[in-house]
Structures are given as structure tokens and as C-alpha cells.
Curated annotation (Swiss-Prot):
Identification of the protein by name: Modulator protein MzrA
Transmembrane segments: 10-29
Family membership noted in the UniProt record: Belongs to the MzrA family.
Alphabetized UniProt keyword annotations: Cell inner membrane, Cell membrane, Membrane, Transmembrane, Transmembrane helix
Subunit structure of this chain's protein: Interacts with EnvZ.
Domain of life (superkingdom): Bacteria
Periplasmic side, ranges: 30-117
Subcellular location: Cell inner membrane
Length: 117
């Protein structure tokens, strides 16, 4: 009662073994974009104004924080940093320089709230 299909070697078994290996190799070789950190600055209370981007640039630049861009957006300011490692220092600097604001640090790949003041 043995089926002839069970005795013959099938091509499926090697393919099932090679597929995970191929998937692993492709995921490791794909180019990865570096993580980018954004600081999202909003007023603490509705109706309060935010400083202009140049003021924010001056505060961060004088402390050596490299900035990619500063963009106003819907009563908030988005600051993109050149180095994700500087996000903690930048958040601390802005929390002191802008006491009436909320500063949230976010990573662009899977938004993660890093810190909040």
C-alpha cells in the first residue's frame, strides 16, 4: 500500500530548506537607511506662539547639534537632526530654551517616543 509518490525524492524538501536561507540573505543584503530623528515642538498651551526656526537653529547650533532641516507645520515645528545620537542633548537644550513647549523626539522608522518634557 505504499504510494509511489512517497518513495520518489521530491524537489519540495530542498526548496523548503533553501527558502529561509534565501530570505535571510536578502534581508541582510538590502540597503538600510539610517535612522532619522525628528523633534516635534508644540506650544504647551493652545494660542501660544512658537519662536521662529532661526532661533531654534541658533540654540542647537551653538551647542554643536547638527540639523538637517527645520519646518513649521500646523502650529508646531519639526526639527530633523543629522545624527540620531544627538536627540537627547537636543531635546534637553530645547526644553531649557523653550520652557513653554512640549518637545517630543521621534524616530522615522516605526515612530517611537523617546522623551517628553
Amino acid at each position: 500500500m505504499n504510494s509511489p509518490g512517497l518513495r520518489k525524492p521530491t524537489i519540495w524538501r530542498p526548496l523548503l530548506l533553501l527558502f529561509p536561507l534565501l530570505a535571510l540573505l536578502l534581508s541582510m543584503s538590502s540597503p538600510r537607511l539610517p535612522d532619522e530623528v525628528m523633534l516635534h515642538i508644540t506650544p504647551l498651551h493652545q494660542g501660544m506662539t512658537l519662536p521662529d526656526g532661526f532661533y531654534i537653529y541658533q540654540r542647537l547650533n551653538e551647542r554643536g547639534i547638527a540639523i538637517k532641516s527645520i519646518t513649521p507645520e500646523n502650529n508646531s515645528i519639526i526639527v530633523r537632526l543629522s545624527s540620531p545620537e544627538q536627540s537627547g542633548a537636543a531635546k534637553e537644550i530645547l526644553s531649557i530654551a523653550l520652557p513653554n513647549t512640549v518637545v517630543i523626539a521621534q524616530r522615522t522608522h516605526g515612530t517611537i517616543r523617546v522623551a517628553r518634557s
